[in-house]
Amino acid sequence: MARKSRKHIAEPIFTSVSPFINTALYIRLSVEDNKKRGNSIETQKMVLKDYLSNKPEFRIYDTYIDNGTTGTNFNREGFQRMLSDIEAGKIDCVIVKDLSRLGRNSIDSGYYIEQYFPSHNVRFIAVTDQFDSENPDNLHGGIILPLKNMINEAYSLDIGRKIKAQ
C-alpha cells in the first residue's frame, strides 16, 4: 500500500476583485472661496473629471460636496457622509482638487491623509498638488505635505482676522 504524503498542497483560492477603483470626488467651497472663480464647485468638478478622463480604472462612486463651509472644521455634512461610505467599504480612493479642499486644519488634514485613509486602505489624491498616496516616490510627502497643510491653515486664520477687522 502506498504511503500518503504529509505535505499539504494548498488549494488555489479565488477571490472576486473588482477591476474598478471606487472613487469619491470631494469638493468643498467656503464662503470666502466663493468669490474666487478658480475654486467654484463647477471648476473643482471639471478638474477632477478631467484628471480621471484618461484613467478608466477609476469609477466615480459619488461626489461629496460641502458648499459654504469652512475648512477648519471637519464636521461637514458631505465629508461625514463620505466617511460613512469609507467605513462601509464602498470607497477605495478619495480625490480632491488640492489639499486645501480637504481642509485647512493642518493637524486634522494630516490625520486623514497619513492615518485614517491608509488604515482604511483608501488612496488619497490631490490633483493640482500632484500628491498621490499610492506613489512611493512621491516627493510631496515627508516635509512638504505637512508644510502645505500648515500654509493652508495660516491662510484660513489670516482670512478670519481680515473679516473680523471689517
Protein language model features and the residues they cover:
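Short, structured surface patches at the beginning of a domain
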Residues: 1-166
